Amino acid sequence: MTAIYKDAGRPVHERVADLLARMTPEEKFAQMHAYWLILDENGNHRERSDLSDEFAGVSEQAALSERLKLGVGQITRPLGTHIVDAKTGVRAANRLQRMMMEETRLGIPALFHEECLVGLLCKDATLFPSSLNYGSTWDPELVQRAAQQIGKEARSVGCQQGLAPVLDVSRDVRWGRTEETFGEDPWLVGVMATAYVKGLQGDKRDLLATLKHYVGHSFSEGARNHAPVHLGFSELNDTFLLPFEMAVKLANAGSVMPAYHDIDNQPGHSDSFLLTTVLREQWGFDGIIVADYGGVSLLHQHHGISHDAAESAALAFNAGLDVELPKDDCARHLADAVERGLISMAKVDEIVGRVLTEKFRLGLFENPYADENGIDLQNEMTRQVAREVATKSVTLLENNGILPLNGKPRVALVGPTADDPLALLSGYSFPAHLIISDMVEETSQVTTPRAALEHYLGASQVRYAKGCHIIEKRMAGAPVFPGDSGGKPMQQSPVSQSTALIPEAVNAALESDVVVACVGDLAGLFQSGTVGEGSDTDSLNLPGVQQLLLEALVATGKPVIVVMTGGRPYTLQGLEDKVAALIVAWAPGQGGGWAIADVLTGRAEPQGRLVVSVPKSAGAMPYYYNHKLKSGGTPFAFHFGSRYPFGFGLGWTTFRWNAARVAASSVPVDGEVTLSVDITNTGERSGSEVVQVYVRDKVATQVRPLQELKAFQRVTLSPGETATLSFTLPVEMFNFTRRDGKRIVEPGEFELQVGASSADIRQVVTVNVTGETRVLPAEWRMLSTCEVTRA
């Protein structure tokens, strides 16, 4: 007779109960962790090690073989760990899965996870733009389409869980992982993350999105990776938890990953209040919680809240963790933890039940293998969508009329990022990610600005000069320490300080009609680059001698168009007023060169709008537009504020905004506000505007931000065309968190600020919210809507 757990016709909860009853404690523990392996299509799998293969002897192989007979919860990044072509990687993963299904006692399949923030992290997958690019499009539908394409590539290689998106809310752009965020507004982060999760998971949730880093990871001391976070619950809930709540409730996210840091002395991996009370009990999250890599071990190694690995495992799993990643450093000690009374088998059963539930839901027991002939990477649709995101995220910050370029001028294309494919990629793209492991992946699918401009203008019209290096040699274990601090340790691969190439760039400029200067940074993990995870900085000056290069180019008197790429905004130390144009393209991925060239030549409009403020200086940090009135200090600090505000971006045309109006000047606390505004294209070219609606609570029982984004809509208009935008905002969106942890809406006056950026407010309307203070229900309304009517 077929076992209940093998019967696909039985309800999932019955299958889980039957399987749990058959499992030994050791088999249960095995489901609570992953293995990080170098898989082999012949079955000679080995554990990933930083040591050379000669240290991984037969005894270790035998030990791994014995451990695998117990099964395993997950396999860590089978295609993303090393350079392997997809078909070979899938064949190797299938070989391991066949062992799980046929050579273990109960035949429980493994779940395979990969990174997928900016595309599936494996050889030959499409290299999508960064999350800052996603956010800068202000186009959730496009973000959802991008995630759909990433999901299709992931499914085609047998991936069931993607470790994305990142829901950290940017607060200090010195933080190296700023590039992974959707920006600095919590609601916009939530909107974009919700779109990404819906796209990646699909309607069936047959690929799990992973919300990370739960929570507040971006607000660490001094913007330093892993450093403590200091937040009260009101701000934690209103700013940092909000995007997670939205993605859980609106998109049914399948997984959550806690963060490395501690909040109020409690590390994220052992915080039962956040992992269980808030996430599961209050929000109704029904997926699995997976550790950030090594996060459980840090409980005793760094945080010092446990004595050993067994205690760390017990703390994390009791708090709400389901699976330790990337391997079993602490979970292997669970038997010891049970024997010592640190965790109960009842708790283990609860956790393993959740893991098995997800495997049954995913259909892994019925369809455990990937189709080796169904791999679909880099198809026409994925390339097209990646390029569309790159193009629509290009943001124009300055333009004295030189853009778009007319005809085919003689262009001096200068700068260290003009012809470097890696300069267009973010840290979690496959080629950049490999640098930390001293592996080099070819980047032929990346089109650089040089290649695109030479294609459009002709090679004879483009004179290229590198101008300077950012880092002369990319390598692992080579700290570059971006920034201005002295007293640095010996650097194996420092940021270059050589000015030897600048004269050649100046000569190129003098012999050209216009200069396109490409500057920025290089993404790399743990200081193998100037931005990225563990690559934080103390300065917002361009790395190396790029500022000197720009100054020399401006001094020629030729018009200089600056194209900045990278993972954080940088200041130009006053050159913003002297250059002819300034474009920010972030890390635009493999189609980035085309996107930049399309905007420069007028083939595309710069449609991007900033999702992180560009601070006046590093002294303003942490800086974000939705700050409090007193954030600038008393007396007001001259360095506080932004050079370019949140929501800002120029286009090719101009718009007239007619008076905003509301359907009713008074609304009840459980009602909604309808706000309308007319927009007319007064220019000579078709163009788009992002109409933004901010709300200010004029008087509240707690200190509130000066403004908060609550609605937006992009509208594209032909010359002379007018459209009416009618926004509907539930009053529930005007809420904040009271000291008792409850979300409330208070009666009173609220300003609705309608503008082209957070600083460019064109119209202000006041509404009066009436009634008594209202505590919001669990299923409160989180989204506004907009209807566009054309005249």
Could you say what each language-model-derived stretch is?
Residues 1-735, 746-754, 758, 780, ...:
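Glycoside hydrolase catalytic-domain context in secreted enzymes
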Residues 740-743:
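Short proline/glycine-enriched turn/loop segments at secondary-structure junctions
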Residues 760-775:
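Short beta-strand elements
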